[in-house]
Structures are given as C-alpha cells and as structure tokens.
Amino acid sequence: EIALNDRSIGIEIVNDFKCQNVGNLNANPDSIELECSFPSYPKNQIDLVLSLIKEILKRHPEIDPIDIVAHSDIAPNRKSDPGPNFPWEEFYNHGIGAWYDISDFNEQLNKLKKQLPSVLEVQCALSIYGYPVELTGVQDRQSQFAVRAFQLHFRPSNYTGLIDEETTAILYALNKKYRSELVDDKTSCKNNND
C-alpha cells in the first residue's frame, strides 16, 4: 500500500471549470500560461463537504491537517481542482486541513523583503511541505505547476505559478507550523525528494 489511492480517501467535488494554455510553448517551453474559468461553489455544497469531512475525521482521527489536500496539490502538472474558489481557510476554521498563522506569515514576509531565497530553496520548501517537485534550482515548468497548485490552495487571489514574496512567506509559515522538524534537518530536501 504505497500508492496514494491505496491509502487515501478521495472526495470528488463536482464544479466544472475550464483551463486553456494561452502561452507560446515554442517561444518559452519552461513557462505555463493558463487561462482558467472557475465557478463559485454553492454554500449548500460546501456545507455538505464540511459535514462529510468532519464525519471522516471522527472515524480517522489519525489524519493530519496537512494530509487534507487538493487534487492539484497531488498532481500539480495535471490537475487544477478544486480551484481558487474552494474555501480552504473556512475549512481550517472548522478544524479541517492546514492554514498558516498570520503572525508567522508577517514574520516571514519581513525577512523576505531583504532578500528572496533562491529557486532551489523554494523548491526545497515545497518538497518539505509535500509537493512533488524536483530540485533543479530553475524556475522550470514543473516548479511553476507546483507553485501554482500551492497558490490555488493557500493564495488563491493570484496563482501565476511564479515565486514571489507572499507565496514564499506563506510556504515558510506553513513549514514552520507543520514541518518544523524537517526544516531544521539539513538533509530533509534530499531525503524528501528521493
């Protein structure tokens, strides 16, 4: 039971969206330029999903907050659902899933105003949090898809897939809260990526 589908509970949320690539892959094959249309979720649908997940967590209290993820978090190069309109912060406020502390975010943001980390350091932080990203040191296509998936989940107001201060501050705040033991382990990026 090492495959994700063998050890997970999936909830398929129907909310049709459409994405199309508007970039020129011949001009810049390492860039993703997707234009997407994501409809809003009806309140009754969100209430039903909240209720369902609460029941699942009662039966499986061993599920960690960081293990409640989106399809796009697991397969960022292939999936975009549930999209930027899914209310992750609201779910966190109901005791479901992970979210960053605003004080940690502000602390990280102040540090990053002096200097943004390298692409490799951000890739490492994404890997520590659990995103499938190869450590290349280049803001390549696979990195942009991973960053975009992260942004769809934690910073849905702007999900370009490009590394910026706000995205990095959120990522670092989440790792501080949920993965501090791995952040302090200097071999965690290598081990997490093997």
Regions found by a protein language model. Name each.
Residues E1-E62, I66:
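Active-site-adjacent loop/helix surface patches within enzyme catalytic domains
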Residues S31-N44, N77-R78, Q108-Q115, P132-G137, ...:
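Second-shell loop/turn segments in exported
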Residues P84-Q108:
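Acidic, His- and aromatic-enriched active-site or binding-groove loops in soluble protein domains
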Residues Q20, A75-R78:
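Short catalytic/ligand-binding loop motif for oxyanion handling, primarily in non-cytosolic enzymes
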